[in-house]
């Protein structure tokens, strides 16, 4: 794709987001044919939206998530600063085509993680992390029929709203993330339960996957960027009026409600 075609695709997707409208698919002259082209479209979103990049998300780190968006593996997506909300925020479901929430662990980097030829281990990645946060993600798509892997990548892997907690204050570095239980209650009733094992076996492994995936394209993870690692529970359907509480046990809770 030419830079002009990349810009056209990103602009079209963003305009549809802004207008609460859906697409059948991207026009043929700006439809990505490779993952590299799809990620190039992502990289333009901060410019076309006027919002700086705040971090990354990982979609489809669990089998349930992969089945939900019809892909066979995880996807990395850019998160824009204007899409991150504080704990307790009210979210709009207006024109949301997916209508689900996900409960996730998120890690903020305290220093730059540059690309390199040798892959980063989970331990090396975690040593560069300064904070753990808890999140509820509200993903969405602008494609009427979940437009296939490449188009989903092009729209930042379904990144939309992300409600996050304050940084966890307890010592979390020795936590067994894999077995740590997470529950979700909707309108006061528990509706989902899972654990970190649903996130590529361990959220820390998912985090290192993201770092190495991004680095393979010559992209750094910036100091201060937040990475939300994928859902610990089966995606929970939500409707306007619902109140959600994601409970991460001793680590804390995240709440949001929908209008």
Regions found by a protein language model. Give the residues of each.
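Catalytic-core "active-site belt" of small-molecule-metabolizing enzymes
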Residues: 2-202, 239, 243, 251-259
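Carbohydrate-binding surfaces in secreted/extracellular proteins
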Residues: 246
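A conserved acidic, glycine/proline-rich C-terminal tail/linker
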Residues: 207-235
